[in-house]
């Protein structure tokens, strides 16, 4: 059986699944001696991520298909390499969350954290909470007029330790803020949350927004991030300090019907990007290489 060869710079859950298929061969990064004594193998499919360096350009120009995770990345590659649209495909990051009834999970989390179950939960987490806008997140939450809400920030021990020094600047959040260090089941926090805000300065596609949508959260994210391609105008922040976001959040929290409708719409949209659906998309591409 002829195998389809793939190469990637960074592994993700979709690639992990592909590697287990019998029709796939993964080309490994060449060591120093291989670079000197053997010709470089060009993959059939190249999964591009990160900077567009010379090696990346070579793979893009010579592979049959390049996969990227946003149209912004696709457009940049086309502009800088002049390859045709036919040689590049967009597959958004995959969602792999064990979906459970958000209402049941919220009851569980509220009991665990001693929160009133009627409170709205506004959630924030990121790999790098500083560059993802944790200060701006706190600024937004402290500007809300709506009263019955709790704020949860989850991060690793070092992130939360450093963040604690900033908390005294937000006295009106003193009784509303919960900081969680190295929380084991982050997915359950997404399921329990009502709103997920990411005032990030990072451009790279935030898969946490897709995860939050899948878990029926109302989301807000800056237009600097490539995930803007899948959210609507209401969810878009002009900048990390967009002054209109607090007003939007107040408005949506006061309209239960609109609030629930957005949560439902977000989940329906995010279902397209489950790992199972993305696996179907990439295998369709493989079949037609």
Feature map (PLM): residue ranges:
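A conserved mid-protein helix/loop that constitutes part of the nucleotide-sugar donor-binding site
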Residues: 120, 127-143
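A charged, aromatic-enriched C-terminal amphipathic alpha-helix characteristic of glycosyltransferases
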Residues: 254-288
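Aromatic "clamp/platform" in nucleotide-sugar-dependent glycosyltransferases that forms part
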Residues: 201
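A short, active-site helix/loop in glycosyltransferases that binds the activated sugar's phosphate group
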Residues: 64-88, 95-99
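Conserved acidic donor-binding segment of nucleotide-sugar-dependent glycosyltransferases
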Residues: 233-243, 251-257
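Short hydrophobic beta-strand element within catalytic cores of glycosyltransferases
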Residues: 218-221
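Glycosyltransferase donor-sugar binding loop
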Residues: 125, 150-163
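Nucleotide-activated donor-binding/catalytic signature segment of Leloir-type glycosyltransferases, i.e.
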Residues: 164-182
């Amino acid at each position: 059986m002829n195998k389809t060869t793939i190469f990637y710079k960074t592994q993700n859950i979709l690639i992990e699944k592909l590697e287990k298929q019998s029709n796939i061969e993964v080309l490994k990064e060449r060591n120093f001696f291989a670079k000197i004594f053997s010709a470089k193998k060009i993959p059939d499919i190249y999964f591009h991520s990160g900077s567009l360096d010379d090696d990346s350009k070579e793979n893009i120009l010579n592979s049959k298909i390049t996969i990227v995770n946003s149209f912004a990345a696709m457009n940049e590659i086309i502009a800088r390499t002049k390859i045709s649209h036919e040689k590049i495909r967009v597959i958004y990051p995959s969602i792999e969350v064990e979906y459970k009834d958000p209402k049941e999970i919220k009851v569980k989390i509220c009991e665990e954290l001693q929160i009133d179950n009627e409170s709205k939960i506004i959630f924030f987490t990121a790999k790098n909470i500083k560059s993802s806008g944790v200060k701006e997140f706190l600024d937004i939450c402290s500007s809300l007029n709506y009263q019955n809400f709790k704020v949860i920030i989850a991060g690793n021990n070092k992130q939360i330790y450093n963040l604690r020094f900033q908390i005294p600047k937000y006295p009106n959040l003193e009784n509303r803020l919960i900081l969680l260090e190295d929380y084991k089941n982050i997915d359950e926090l997404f399921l329990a949350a009502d709103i997920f805000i990411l005032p990030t300065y990072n451009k790279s596609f935030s898969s946490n927004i897709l995860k939050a949508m899948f878990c029926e959260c109302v989301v807000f994210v800056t237009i600097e991030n490539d995930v803007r391609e899948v959210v609507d105008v209401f969810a878009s922040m002009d900048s990390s300090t967009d002054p209109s976001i607090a007003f939007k959040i107040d408005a949506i929290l006061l309209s239960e019907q609109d609030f629930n409708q957005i949560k439902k719409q977000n989940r329906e949209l995010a279902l397209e990007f489950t790992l199972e659906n993305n696996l179907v998309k990439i295998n369709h591409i493989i079949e037609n290489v």
